[in-house]
Amino acid sequence: MNKKEVISYSGFSMMPPESVELLENNKGRVVINENEKIVDVPDYKILSFWDRIEQLGIWKWKKKYNSKYEILDGYQWQLKLRNRKGEAKHIEGHESYPKNFKDLIKELNILFGTKIEF
C-alpha cells in the first residue's frame, strides 16, 4: 500500500512567506507574495523529484539547521517529505542550511514551476 506523498516547503524572512505543497490528484499549492495558485504537477515530475532527493542525499540531512549566533530575524525554512515508500523527513532551519540547499530549491522550482529564490 502506498503512503500519502508529502512534499511541502515554506520559507520566510522579512518578506511574505513562500510555500509549495503537493496536494492530491497531481495538484500543487503555490503561495508566493501572498498570492495562492493551484498548479498541475505531472506524475513524471514527482518521480523525477524523488530521484533527485535521493541523489542529493536529503534523507541524510540533519533535522535542524540553526545559526550558531542569535539572530532575531533572518530566513527561516521548513521542509516536509514523505515518498511513496513511506520514507519521511522533517527538516527546519534558521539562517543555516545544508551544503546543497540551493539544489533542493532548484528541484522544488522545477517540480512546481516556481521561482523561489535563495
Sequence positions of predicted segments:
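Short amphipathic alpha-helical segments, especially helix-boundary/capping motifs
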Residues: 26, 53-54
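Short, flexible N-terminal segments of the mature chain
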Residues: 19-38
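Short, thiol/selenol-centered motifs that function as redox-active sites or metal-ligating centers
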Residues: 12-18
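Short, well-ordered, aromatic-rich surface patches in folded extracellular/luminal domains
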Residues: 1-12, 37-48, 52-53, 59-118
